[in-house]
Swiss-Prot record:
TM segment ranges: none
Lineage of source species: Eukaryota, Viridiplantae, Streptophyta, Embryophyta, Tracheophyta
Source organism superkingdom: Eukaryota
SMART domains linked: DUF3452, RB_A
InterPro entries named among the record's database cross-references: Cyclin-like_sf, RB_A, RB_B, RB_fam, RB_N
Protein name in the entry: Retinoblastoma-related protein
Gene3D superfamilies noted in UniProt: 1.10.472.140, Cyclin-like
Main localization, broad class: nucleus
GO molecular function terms listed in the Swiss-Prot or TrEMBL record: RNA polymerase II transcription regulatory region sequence-specific DNA binding
Entry's localization field: Nucleus
Annotated function: Regulator of biological processes that recruits a histone deacetylase to control gene transcription. May play a role in the entry into mitosis, negatively regulating the cell proliferation. Formation of stable complexes with geminiviridae replication-associated proteins may create a cellular environment which favors viral DNA replication.
Single GO BP term: cell differentiation
Organism of derivation: Camellia sinensis
């Protein structure tokens, strides 16, 4: 199926890489052998590849330890693959050029990796090292737009999506069909164990790839592709011989009956897989067209056919192909589909997606991309198990059944009614919310919203509508048939693209109007007035809302071609602007599906940890007002954000290209492909819900005033302050902040969020490293002091880089036997860790005052620690040294920092009280939450009187028998007849459920309240009388 190139014996490198006169082939000779013998490149491509290799090979010797396992031979193979992948993607001759035919230039990424003996997962994990090091060379050779043309993050997102979809398809196929074509009623155990893939399974996947290639065009989002797979599944059910079925239409509870006509196949699949019946029918029609065009099969209306396959199936609207999967035609159909795919993708340099039909293929790799750019999987989860493992896709988020199913006689679902959540099922559930709740809304302001818009000093309705249309057209550009428009990873090449963009644009528009109305209502209640002129005439506020709405739509569909932060570029705002809006959105997030709440949580964290600190962030514009002492360094590094492009400028660009928007000058130039550390950015990093505590404090309240620290219960929560100050001019006084400017309020709130985020990460590392609470306090105080007194250390850097250096610095002054390697290994053991953060740290040598070094570059974390971090923070470290080592360290040489104490900086606070983890609701109908209990809190929490209500790992309430018996005993105590204080009856369905929002708020209040105490036992509310 897949083209397998010859596998020559590539000469290997020794530790010297270049073999200086040792008799072995040189580095250049090994690369030439790789190109000529391994991939059979023609002369032009070989010359171009050798040029890029020659200009970048000097970087290889300095990067060996940071690539793979750190061996020269392996690093060399990676570098060869990186160079050839870049040449393939960036060469002008490869840009949609079919003139190459089947020549030597038609090599694919999979062929490169086979010759290099690498797998896809490892390739994408290590690619950022090459990108950040060779970026200037690629820019010189291929132009400044090389990052967009390389499309590394899009290709990686596509790989993750296909990994998820292939597993989803495999599970679905095995639910309906036997894994081997046996005439017996049992599946072949040996076939399942060996990973055997039947020809029917293979045919379905190849037909799906044809659908992706010819019908979905550029927009291959996860939801659309899942609809495609379900459509393929319907075609297989109709055409695969009955002897291979793993179900019975009469007995299976999975199917919906359509009166006396039989099973309504499409309605049944929609119920099982949460798809739209309308979309499913449209996708099936496209697939049928492809069967006709590619396989040259003749279609017939299923109602006119008499086939065993169609018995007991309602055939209305279904198409049947007589000999589609007959034993005689199946082999030729497989060959035709394989050749069609190869011809369509030969010159694109992308993945050969046929490898996913066989999970045993060595190219796929043993791991996942959980810690890299496309972080769809989360901590402790593989690539196919996003979301809470115990959560099902039933209530409260599962929408109602499809219209046709609601009028049919439905058979109650069996095992499929509670399907374990996976990334695909979660995406489909979220998409159904968007389809059933948001899509029916009108694409214009509601009468209530219009009242707010017309109540301003002058009616702003027209301005709001015009702005929304222009910005959303910029994010989801339309394009005429045959036109091509590349915008931040978005390429419109067909009518399908225009339809897709129009649908997403309407969804974002309706969501924007709905949220805007809710925000206006809340703001009017706070101000006791309907005139919101200051807010509703603020351009930045509206663009942030539009960007947030579009991002939620994109996150719902999980597009692989428009990844965050593309919405920032299209709207002209910065990461700091969006972080304010995300904070506001948490006030109104109760109606959002769980996964969109998680997306906002993870987006907030990603913005805070690095993006807000990158060059071009509007945070620096506010910082120079709030902290004038930092203006010189901010200006020297050219960190200030450029002015936001006007609506007229955006509209002008749209008119130039007849409705599509060419790339505008980017306000976040380095955010397109790379973070400031060279890591490929991801649209979704799974974030456990406890992180919502970072943003539950109102985004626009100054922590200096501590207004929100006096609340003890949700009922006593005071109304949040007005939004106007959040998006006002930085120099404008904030009337509700006691004389502060709006910039000071914004920076104080931002710093408080950074402190909270730092506390979470420090606490997690302390636990993994098994350090004492005293060390934790010292590290946390150092982190706070650096933020307030050495703020420039954060400029252009990731906060994890600062945290890691804090750990090592405190370990040194505390005389702990903790090495840098141990700290990094501990961090990298976390699946969410991005190793590039520690392998590539920004350094400006001119500010470091180091002789012989000038300019800017990215270095490893140890170099940064020695050359930049320690000279700046040594005085702070000496002050924080534990008793006994302080005096000794005071006599050491100290170097004064350049920042100094910033006026108005928040005072250093003790380590905050943090929740162990967000409690997880284990049942939709039972009022039961599960949360881990740390041993440090066990003794304080579990008193003698309440100990029998807890089950602790490693400790039983009586002589241990078994875990199940212990849990049963506890449950019996809770639900026994004896009247116990605070007894909770989990079997009563009528008991009021505790909402997720209430739980999140209780955690927030525990962290923020001065009266809260981590050592106080948790008192349960008495629910029975």
């Amino acid at each position: 199926m897949e083209d397998h190139p010859p596998k020559p014996s590539i000469p290997t490198a020794d530790a010297s890489l270049s073999n200086h006169g040792r008799g072995g082939p040189s580095l250049d000779a090994r690369f030439a052998y790789f190109c000529k013998t391994g991939l059979s490149l023609n002369e032009n491509t070989y010359t171009e590849a050798m040029k890029l290799f020659s200009e970048s090979k000097h970087l290889l010797s300095t990067t060996i330890s940071a690539i793979g396992t750190g061996t020269p031979e392996e690093a060399e193979r990676y570098w060869f693959a990186f160079v050839l992948y870049s040449v393939k993607r960036l060469s002008e001759a490869n840009a949609d050029d079919s003139s190459q035919g089947t020549g030597g230039d038609g090599f694919t990424l999979c062929q490169i990796l086979r010759v290099a003996k690498l797998n896809i997962v490892d390739f994408f994990k290590e690619l950022p090292q090459f990108i950040v090091k060779a970026g200037p060379i690629l820019s010189n050779q291929y132009g400044t737009d090389w990052e967009k043309r390389l499309e590394a993050k899009e290709l990686q997102a596509n790989f993750v999506h296909l990994s998820l979809l292939s597993k989803y398809y495999k599970r679905a196929f095995r639910e309906f069909f036997l894994t081997s074509d046996a005439k017996v009623g049992e599946q072949s155990t040996a076939a399942i164990a060996s990973g055997y893939v039947s020809d029917y399974h293979r045919f379905g996947w190849l037909l799906f790839l044809a659908l992706r290639t010819h019908a979905f065009s550029r927009f291959k989002d996860l939801v659309t592709c899942t609809n495609g797979l379900v459509a393929i599944l319907a075609i297989l059910i109709i055409h695969i011989p009955v002897r291979v079925r793993n179900f019975n239409l009469h007995d299976s509870p999975r199917f919906v009956m359509k009166g006396s006509k039989g099973v309504d196949l499409l309605a049944s699949l929609c119920n099982i897989y949460e798809t739209s019946e309308d979309e499913l029918r449209k996708t099936m029609e496209k697939a049928n067209d492809l069967i006709e065009d590619i396989l040259k099969k003749n279609r017939r209306s299923a109602s006119e056919c008499r086939s065993e396959n169609l018995e007991n199936i309602a055939t209305d609207g279904l198409i049947y192909f007589e000999d589609l999967l007959d034993d005689t035609s199946l082999p030729s159909s497989l060959n035709i589909l394989g050749k069609d795919y190869a011809d369509a993708t030969r010159n694109k340099g992308e993945l050969d997606e046929r490898v996913f039909v066989n999970e045993e293929d060595s190219l796929l790799g043993p791991g996942s991309l959980s810690g890299g750019a496309m972080n769809i999987s989360g901590a402790k989860r593989k690539i196919d198990s996003i979301a809470s493992p115990a959560r099902t896709i039933t209530s409260p988020l599962a929408p109602y059944c499809s219209p046709s199913a609601s009028h049919a006689k439905a058979i109650p679902c069996g095992s499929n009614s509670k399907m374990a959540a996976t990334p695909v099922t979660t995406a489909m559930t979220t998409a159904k919310w968007l389809r059933t709740i948001i899509s029916p809304l009108p694409p214009k302001p509601s009468p209530e919203l219009e009242r707010f818009l017309s109540s301003c000093d002058s009616d702003v309705t027209t301005d709001v509508i015009r702005r929304a249309n222009i910005i959303l057209e910029a994010i989801f550009p339309s394009s005429g048939l045959g036109e091509e428009c590349i915008t931040g990873g978005l390429q419109c090449t067909s009518l399908m693209d225009s339809i897709w963009a129009e649908q997403r644009r309407l969804e974002a528009l309706k969501l924007y109007y709905r949220v805007l109305q809710a925000m206006c209502t809340a703001e009017a209640q706070i101000l006791h007035a309907n005139n919101l002129t200051s807010l509703l005439t603020n351009e930045r506020f509206h663009r942030c809302m539009l960007a947030c709405s579009a991002e939620l739509v994109l996150a719902t569909h999980k597009t692989a071609t428009m990844l965050f932060p593309a919405v920032l570029e299209r709207t002209g705002i910065t990461a700091f602007d969006l972080s304010k809006m995300i904070g506001v959105s948490f006030r109104l997030k109760e109606s959002l599906p769980r996964e969109l709440k998680r997306h906002l949580n993870s987006l907030e964290e990603r913005l805070l940890e690095s993006m807000v600190w990158e060059k071009g962030s509007s945070m620096y514009n506010s910082l120079t007002v709030a902290r004038p002492a930092l203006s010189a360094e901010t200006n020297r590094l050219c960190l200030l954000a450029e002015p936001m492009p006007s609506l007229d400028a955006i509209a002008m660009h749209m008119n130039i290209t007849c409705g599509s928007l060419p790339c505008l000058p980017s306000l976040q130039k380095n955010e397109i492909l790379l973070g400031q550390n060279g890591d490929i950015q991801s649209p979704k990093r799974l974030c456990t819900e406890y992180r919502s505590v970072l943003v539950e404090r109102n985004s626009f309240t100054s922590p200096v005033k501590d207004r929100l620290l006096t609340f003890n219960t949700p009922k006593s929560k005071l109304p949040p302050p007005a939004l106007q100050s959040a998006f006002a001019s930085p120099t404008r006084p904030n009337p509700g902040a006691g004389g502060e400017t709006c910039a000071e309020t914004a920076i104080n709130v931002f710093f408080s969020k950074i402190v909270k985020l730092g506390a979470f990460r420090i606490n997690g590392m302390v636990e993994r490293l098994q350090l004492s609470q005293e060390i934790r306090e010292i590290i946390f105080r150092l982190f706070q002091q650096i933020l307030s007194q050495r703020t420039t250390l954060f400029f252009n850097r990731h906060i994890d880089q600062i945290i890691l250096c804090c750990f090592y610095g405190v370990a040194k002054i505390s005389q702990l036997s903790l090495t840098f390697k141990e700290i990094i290994s501990t961090i990298e053991s976390n699946p969410q860790c991005k190793p590039q953060v520690f392998r590539s740290v920004f350094v400006d040598w001119s500010s470091a005052r180091r002789h012989g070094k000038t300019g800017q570059e990215h270095v490893d974390i140890i170099t940064f620690y020695n050359e930049i971090f320690i000279p700046a923070v040594k005085p702070l470290l000496v002050e924080l040294a534990p008793v006994g080592t302080a005096q000794k360290n005071r006599n050491s040489e100290t170097i004064n920092g350049t920042d100094g104490q910033c006026p108005g900086s928040p005072k250093i606070s003790p380590f905050p009280s943090l929740p162990d983890m967000s409690p997880k609701k284990v049942s939709a109908i039972h009022n039961v939450y599960v949360s881990p209990l740390r041993s440090s809190k066990m003794d304080a929490l579990i008193s003698n009187g309440s100990k029998s209500y807890y089950a602790c790992v490693g400790e039983s309430t009586h002589a241990y028998q078994s875990l199940s018996k212990d849990l049963t005993a506890i449950n019996n105590r809770l639900n026994g007849n004896r009247k116990l204080r605070g007894t909770l009856n989990f079997d009563e369905v009528d008991v009021g459920l505790v909402s997720d929002t209430l739980v999140a708020n209780s955690l927030w209040l525990q962290n923020g309240s001065c009266a809260s105490s981590s050592g106080a036992p948790v008192k349960s509310e008495r629910l029975d009388s």
